[in-house]
Amino acid sequence: MKKGGLICFTGLDGSGKTTQAEKLLNTLKKKNIDAIYSWSRREPYLIKPIVTLVKKILKESSKSEGKDYLNIKKKRKRRLFKYPLFQKMWISIAIVDYLAKLFFQIYVPFYKGKVVICDRYIPDMIADFAANFDYNNYQIRKLLKNPLLRMFPKPDKYFYIKVPANLGYKRKLDDTSFEYLSEREKIYNFLAKEMNMVVINGTQDIDNVFEKIKVEMRI
């Protein structure tokens, strides 16, 4: 079966990755390249009922994480995530669930020869795990070697749109907390090196950022 292409954008909320992914999609379509856009944030799919139950146990509301991120994280660690066995089990289940979610979004079009422009992908999932479980760099490296990750199509390009947490916070119009972004900023910076991403300064204006992407894509 013919394989297509996979271009992934990753970075903090508020980095502008969605804007750049959409600009790339439009540019490729103008060149008559069969491309599609996939918003691929890891969210509960088959395991949604389990996640809902866990949140009820922890007495969390759907909007509470952004407003009270640090307290919720401490509560999770005290109750469930403090057990290493539970962490490993949960990560494996979540990865398989993510694979199922992406089957029609990425797998099918990719193996039909389309170019899939992915807004969020494996690094964003890893960043969530690392933040939730307070993983250090050594633990993140081990997580990147999880055999289940080999089942994901390998991207042709990883674009990390890099912005500081304070800028991402200013750009966001929802309840995302600064602490949430600050914690993940360090993780993304580490992942960018470990996964050989193309790092682009997202503090520039939109057109300048896209020019850098076009150079990397040779379009």
Predicted features by range, described:
Residues 17:
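Conserved lysine of the Walker
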